[in-house]
């Protein structure tokens, strides 16, 4: 029934296998790729174009179902919802690797679906997903004539490179690099780096490329065994349209000579509309006209750059656009910056929060909490378009994650800066490299906030014009240079090293020589931008702004955590309500207090410490009147505990009625003189000097009455321990009428001199 074909290799100690013929046989190409115990089903389906289009409708989806990790989805419906950021990012990595390899002019709809079947939590799925995609394309019959593979590279503390590091190895790695390539060239790079040098990063790329070769050989052998060869493809002949476009060469050159983006866009629109109207009247297909115009413009601009040795906006190849920087542009925010580079502008705003504001990420490795968030927004008005603002798409998620990777290596440890940090980058206008403007703006905004980052970070996008054996590398590319060029190579880092890389190609790969030159030229540009940034703000604020919540951290014993939280959170809620602060308690006993002011934070700290401090006989504490009965006052101690006080302990004088001295809500200092059997403290107000808060040293009222002191104590104790249903008068002890046994002060609690307090 099944005609199964399977090929496998031992790839650096782990088995990598490709299999087809058993699952999803109705797809044009279907491959199950296994790497370790991680298994992914990749399917490719092609739909013949029914109408001419001027782009490649390629759709790549990586899907991680919960069952692959042995979990049931949360929520009411218990089904997977929209793609997670991780799924989106993996989909983008695959798309960016294979898109340049389809033949020019091929516009059939291609659907690539990567289903994660099982995940071993050791081998990350990015690598096998790309390998399976290339293998499925190779046997699908689609005109895909290149064989590439992907690999991940890590780097340990001794600068030893690690091939496809495990999840645990990657957590300790100085480098998180994913690259794809063929036998001779590099096609795509995505990386987060902990300030490594250009040389180290280049060596890591070479290391990864070297270890791609066995996989490329495996895919070729697998495809040859299956025998379904890619079909040949001949692009639509547009030579007649191209010949007509030569009449408009001068018009295009004049339009592209305008250095201001808005003027250039308007001039180009006039030329394009003129061409479209003229050629449509001549009976040419509108889609083919549009495709031919794009191809013509691409050749024209590249030729202009080579011929004139200057770029569209008259800059030199390595020249950076004019930069304007402002910090603290929005004073009432926690931190802000406006970064403008040419016609690209990013408004970046930060907000600080508590641990409760952390993002809970449902990742394939399990739930985790993220205390640093960076969100990138690209509204239509940034490029002069009139359309609705929608939810963030793949591009916005990808650009935000790239900026996150660039900033993450320089952030302080949570123990050093206990805030949750959210950064939002609003792109106000764009003419290329808006993600790198986000990196620069984020660095400035964080320093304006007072976040102690290790060093400022800047980013730059590099471009490429390649013609046979000649190439030109461009620094700080415009949007048109990105669109019409061969490469978009984004590099971010500090003055000491690289923190993030992202390279996308429009052609089937570049050499190590071009990668090396691009990195070196990017370093020069990055240092120039950092110099401009440092002239505005070079280090973080020494203190956060007045309206930013304060954080006070301290530790309590682990065995006190339960008491600090209280039954169903009663104690911690009480302290938060009384102090107007937020309190978080970690498993290690660390208590973090967030309050508007340092005073409130200190007050909350004291309340929390008081609430877990054991009450001791003889201690003087604050008390508040909660309820007054005929002879008993119910008190709330300011540590959240309850207490009681007899009428005889209210004042150092005869008291007919408690209300004559105290009212509900009054606060005062009280002495703990004993405890009931249930632990409720008995208190005395008269034994404390209310002015000084110290033990009263003077003569107490009626202390000369020697007889009846024991009876008085019994009366005191019996009154506290009365049941509510007992009749007060029937149980009232008889006051002694006469007799003095001695002149010593009465002892409370146990009649033992070692435990009594005076």
Curated annotation (Swiss-Prot):
It catalyses: RNA(n+1) + phosphate = RNA(n) + a ribonucleoside 5'-diphosphate. Residues 707-758 are annotated as: Disordered. Residues 549-608 form the KH domain. GO terms for molecular function: 3'-5'-RNA exonuclease activity; magnesium ion binding; polyribonucleotide nucleotidyltransferase activity; RNA binding. Belongs to the polyribonucleotide nucleotidyltransferase family. Its main location: cytoplasm. It is found in: Cytoplasm. Keywords: Cytoplasm, Magnesium, Metal-binding, Nucleotidyltransferase, RNA-binding, Transferase. HAMAP family: PNPase. This is Polyribonucleotide nucleotidyltransferase. The gene is pnp.
């Amino acid at each position: 029934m099944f005609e199964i074909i399977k090929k496998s290799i031992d790839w650096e100690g782990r088995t990598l296998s490709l299999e087809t013929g058993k699952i999803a046989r109705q797809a044009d190409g279907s491959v199950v790729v296994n790497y370790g115990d991680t298994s992914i089903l990749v399917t490719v389906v092609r739909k013949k174009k029914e109408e001419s289009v001027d782009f490649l409708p390629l759709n790549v989806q990586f899907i991680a179902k919960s069952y692959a990790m042995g979990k049931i989805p949360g929520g009411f419906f218990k089904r997977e919802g929209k793609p997670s950021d991780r799924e989106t990012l993996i989909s983008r990595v695959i798309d960016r690797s294979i898109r340049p390899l389809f033949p020019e002019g091929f516009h059939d709809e291609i659907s690539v679906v990567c289903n994660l079947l099982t995940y071993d939590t050791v081998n990350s799925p990015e690598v096998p997903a790309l390998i399976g995609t290339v293998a499925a394309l190779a046997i699908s019959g689609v005109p895909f004539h290149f064989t590439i593979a992907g690999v991940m590279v890590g780097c340990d503390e001794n600068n030893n490179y690690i091939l496809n590091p495990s999840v645990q190895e990657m957590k300790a790695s100085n480098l998180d690099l994913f690259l794809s390539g063929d036998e001779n060239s590099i096609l795509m790079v995505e990386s987060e780096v902990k300030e490594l040098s250009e040389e180290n990063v280049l060596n890591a790329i070479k290391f990864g490329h070297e270890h791609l070769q066995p996989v490329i050989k495996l895919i070729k052998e697998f495809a040859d065994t299956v025998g379904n060869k890619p079909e040949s493809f001949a692009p639509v002949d547009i030579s007649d349209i191209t010949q007509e476009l030569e009449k408009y060469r001068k018009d295009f050159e004049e339009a592209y000579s305008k250095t201001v983006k808005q003027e250039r866009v308007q001039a180009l629109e006039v030329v394009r509309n003129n061409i479209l109207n003229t050629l449509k009247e001549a009976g040419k297909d509108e889609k083919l006209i549009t495709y031919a115009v794009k191809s013509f413009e691409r050749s024209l601009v590249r030729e202009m750059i080579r011929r004139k040795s200057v770029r569209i906006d008259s800059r030199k190849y390595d020249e950076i656009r004019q930069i304007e920087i402002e910090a603290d542009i929005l004073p009432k925010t926690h931190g802000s910056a406006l970064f403008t580079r040419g016609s690209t502008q990013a408004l970046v705003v930060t907000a600080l929060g508590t641990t409760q504001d952390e993002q809970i990420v449902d990742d394939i490795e399990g739930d985790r909490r993220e205390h640093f968030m960076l969100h990138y927004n690209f509204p239509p008005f940034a490029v002069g378009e009139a359309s609705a603002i929608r939810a963030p798409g793949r591009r916005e998620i990808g650009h935000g994650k790239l900026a996150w990777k660039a900033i993450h290596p320089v952030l302080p440890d949570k123990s050093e800066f206990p805030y949750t940090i959210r950064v939002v980058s609003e792109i106000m206008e764009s003419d290329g490299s808006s993600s790198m403007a986000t990196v620069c703006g984020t660095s400035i905004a964080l320093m304006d906030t007072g976040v102690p980052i290790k060093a400022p970070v800047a980013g730059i996008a590099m471009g490429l014009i390649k013609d046979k054996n000649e190439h030109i590398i461009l620094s700080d590319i415009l949007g048109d240079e990105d669109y019409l060029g061969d490469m978009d190579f984004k590099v971010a880092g500090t003055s000491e090293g690289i923190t993030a890389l992202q390279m996308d190609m429009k052609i089937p790969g570049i050499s190590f020589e071009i990668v090396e030159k691009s990195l070196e030229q990017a370093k020069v540009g990055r240092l120039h931008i950092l110099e401009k940034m440092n002239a505005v703000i070079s280090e973080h604020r020494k203190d956060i702004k007045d309206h930013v919540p304060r954080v006070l951290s301290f530790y309590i014993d682990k065995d006190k955590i339960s008491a600090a939280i209280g039954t169903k959170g009663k104690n911690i809620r009480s302290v938060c309500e009384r102090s107007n602060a937020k309190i978080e308690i970690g498993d290690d006993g660390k208590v973090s207090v967030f309050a508007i002011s340092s005073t409130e934070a200190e007050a909350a700290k004291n309340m929390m410490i008081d609430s877990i401090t054991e009450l001791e006989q003889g201690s003087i504490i604050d008390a508040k009147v909660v309820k007054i009965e005929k002879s008993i006052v119910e008190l709330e101690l300011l540590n959240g505990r309850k207490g009681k006080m007899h009428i005889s302990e209210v004042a150092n004088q005869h008291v007919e009625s408690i209300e004559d001295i105290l009212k509900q809500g009054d606060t005062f200092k009280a002495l703990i003189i004993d405890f009931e059997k249930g632990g409720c403290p008995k208190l005395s107000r008269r034994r404390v000097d209310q002015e000084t808060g110290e033990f009263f040293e003077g003569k107490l009222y009626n202390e000369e009455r020697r007889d009846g002191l024991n009876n008085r104590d019994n009366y005191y104790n019996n009154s506290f321990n009365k049941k509510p249903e007992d009749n007060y008068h029937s149980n009232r002890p008889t006051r002694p009428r006469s007799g003095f046994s001695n002149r010593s002060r009465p002892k409370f609690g146990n009649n033992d001199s070692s435990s009594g307090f005076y």
